[in-house]
A protein has these predicted regions:
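Sequence/structural signature of beta-propeller domains
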Residues: 1-253
Length: 253
């Protein structure tokens, strides 16, 4: 492949050199405190399921080697995605010489309902965490806490922004900071000592496969799922939200 082809067909180039296949990586960010790198892997509903066209070309699975009873190829659970039909996503943690030829990683979060056995929250007590699904963007505050915004929540709840401790005895503790309107996506968080800024994308969007109440009219311009931010009967609009702490205390402590 030429250098130009590598830039355009990056996933194919990665397969050729044996890169680790992941479940829809959406964002990546290094910790300003430790240098560890964190990646949000949103989900992969095809993992462990036969490909719709029997070709094996489902998501990150171009040449599946396993088949189901009907001979259809599928992508099985792997070490990097230890569950089949990964609906809720993962947060990957990498720590190594990033200029080296080899690296090491582990999973900080295996997202989903804490009551489910497959979920993992960095070793923290699962009875004391906020459920999180479909991590999309990641950011850090000045104290080294990871903040995760979500997109496409598969737990029948709205998307939101979550703070996650990555070091110390509270490692893996996940706290919901805010949620966005139904069918909207939380993205692009920016964390400061006294305020948090976040984007609210496509509020009012109709997603019938997720069971949102669309009635008999699937047109989001006439029957949106919300009227945020103006309310009433106004058209929903994307917006940037700023949450400000007014008591003088800092966010993330």
């Amino acid at each position: 492949m030429t250098a130009e082809e590598v830039c355009i067909y990056t996933r194919i180039a990665g397969d050729k050199v044996g890169a680790t296949r992941m479940d829809r990586p959406e964002d990546i960010e290094p910790s300003p405190k430790t240098g560890k790198v964190y990646a949000a892997l949103t989900n992969n509903k095809y993992r462990g399921k036969a490909s719709p066209d029997n070709s094996g070309k489902t998501q990150d699975n171009k040449a599946a080697k396993k088949t189901d009873g009907a001979g259809r190829p599928y992508e099985d659970a792997t070490e990097v995605a230890p569950i089949t039909e990964n609906k809720n996503g993962l947060v990957l943690e990498m720590e190594d010489d990033h200029a080296g030829t080899k690296g090491k990683w582990n999973l900080l979060l295996v997202c989903g309902d804490p009551n489910e056995a497959y979920t993992y929250f960095g070793g923290f007590d699962k009875e004391s965490v906020s459920p999180i699904s479909c991590p999309d963007n990641v950011a850090f505050d000045e104290y080294g806490n990871l903040w995760v915004s979500t997109d496409g929540n598969a737990l029948d709840s709205n998307d939101g922004l979550f703070a996650v401790a990555v070091e110390g005895e509270r490692r893996g503790e996940t706290k919901c900071f805010l949620t966005v309107p139904v069918a909207a996506e939380t993205c692009g968080p920016q964390i400061f000592s006294n305020r948090v800024m976040v984007n609210v994308q496509h509020p009012g969007e109709i997603e019938t496969d997720q069971g949102h109440p669309v009635g008999d009219n699937p047109d989001p311009t006439t029957n949106p799922t919300s009227h945020w931010p103006d309310g009433g009967k106004e058209q929903p609009r994307p917006a940037v939200v700023q949450v400000v702490r007014t008591d003088g205390k800092k966010i993330g402590v």
